[in-house]
């Protein structure tokens, strides 16, 4: 420990620096000592407990959860919205607000942004800030349309166009379905100029915003209602844990080849992995397996979720 004179000097310097907001250069001039000495004594004051710094975590009660998610799953970003005492729609809205702030912070001029479909992605898009000037970004769908199996407000084209309107961005829409009747039709569409234009953006995607599917979903977006009983039974038999853009994987993140694989028009998971930011937005116990599989497969490197789901993932 320092002698009493050193301690008094450290306290004096700390008081000037932290309480009176003086710069280290100003303190050095006032006390007649080198600036490097000021820096060294401030550091020593923290190390010896003379100076303590407290962060008020009430302003972000979920910060610890975010840090743990990043560490456990190697994420670039994790955002956890509060869920205590909130109805499901309120939780979804809060998650969308937090996700929109994240996207707004991460976007760079010239970025290509890809969108999937669904409620969670819609919540994020609706909360994107309305820009008065162009962000010079391009918004594109990364999956075909759901062929009337989703409400129009959740359609990938609705979300892509809506985001572009808010960001003052260029947009391209998908004039093809996500799931075809057979591989021959799919292959024919893939030869069209329209599909080639859309899919060319997938090769250089900067940011992806994706919802996450799961076999436990019980509402109108469940796999049985969306893909039909035969395909749904096939997914269950193959122990599928989740999907992104109708690309299926198991709980360990391994891709699962299904009866639909050769009939699907959406971004390949390898290309999704290459995006600078692949942002998954999902919440709820029923989405747990889908989120966990996506994290294990590293199909997303950013996660936006709620507190309850974050705690499940960290168990």
From Swiss-Prot:
DNA-binding region: 24-43
Keyword flag Zinc: no
Keyword set includes Transmembrane: no
Molecular-function annotations in GO: carbohydrate binding; DNA binding; DNA-binding transcription factor activity
Gene3D superfamilies xrefs: 3.40.50.1360, Homeodomain-like
InterPro entries in UniProt: ArsR-like_HTH, Homeodomain-like_sf, NagB/RpiA_transferase-like, RNA_pol_sigma70_r4, SorC_transcr_regulators, Sugar-bd_dom_put
Tree of life domain: Bacteria
Keywords carried by this UniProt record: Activator, DNA-binding, Repressor, Transcription, Transcription regulation
Pfam families (UniProt xref): Sigma70_r4 (PF04545), Sugar-bind (PF04198)
Family indicated by similarity: Belongs to the SorC transcriptional regulatory family.
Primary role: Positively regulates, in the presence of L-sorbose, and negatively regulates, in the absence of L-sorbose, the transcription of the sor operon.
Protein name as it appears in the record: Sorbitol operon regulator
Native organism: Klebsiella pneumoniae
Gene that encodes the chain: sorC
């Amino acid at each position: 420990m320092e002698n009493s004179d050193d301690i008094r000097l450290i306290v004096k310097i700390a008081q000037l620096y932290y309480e009176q907001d003086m710069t280290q250069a100003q303190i050095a001039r006032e006390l007649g000592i080198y600036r490097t000495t000021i820096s060294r004594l401030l550091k020593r004051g923290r190390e010896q407990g003379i100076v303590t710094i407290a962060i008020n975590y009430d302003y972000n009660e979920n910060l610890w959860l975010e840090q743990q998610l990043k560490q456990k799953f190697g994420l670039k970003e994790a955002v956890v919205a509060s869920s205590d005492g909130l109805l499901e729609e309120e939780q979804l809205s809060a998650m969308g607000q937090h996700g929109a702030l994240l996207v707004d912070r991460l976007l760079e001029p010239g970025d290509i942004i890809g969108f999937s479909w669904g409620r969670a992605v819609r919540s994020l898009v609706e909360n994107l800030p309305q820009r008065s000037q162009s962000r010079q970004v391009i918004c594109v769908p990364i999956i075909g349309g759901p062929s009337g199996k989703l409400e129009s407000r959740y359609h990938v084209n609705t979300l892509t166009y809506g985001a572009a309107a808010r960001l003052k961005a260029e947009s391209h829409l998908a004039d093809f379905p996500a799931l075809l009747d057979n591989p021959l039709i799919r292959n024919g569409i893939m030869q069209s100029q329209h599909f080639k234009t859309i899919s060319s953006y997938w090769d250089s995607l900067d940011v992806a915003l994706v919802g996450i599917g799961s076999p436990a979903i019980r509402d109108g977006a469940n796999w049985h209602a969306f893909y039909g009983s035969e395909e749904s039974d096939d997914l269950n038999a193959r122990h599928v844990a989740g999907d992104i853009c109708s690309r299926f994987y198991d709980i360990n993140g391994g891709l699962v080849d299904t009866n639909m694989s050769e009939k699907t028009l959406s971004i390949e998971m390898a290309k999704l992995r290459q995006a600078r930011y692949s942002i998954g937005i999902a919440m709820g116990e029923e989405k747990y397996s889908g989120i966990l599989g996506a994290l294990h497969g590293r199909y997303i490197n950013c996660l936006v979720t709620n507190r309850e789901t974050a705690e499940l993932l960290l168990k």
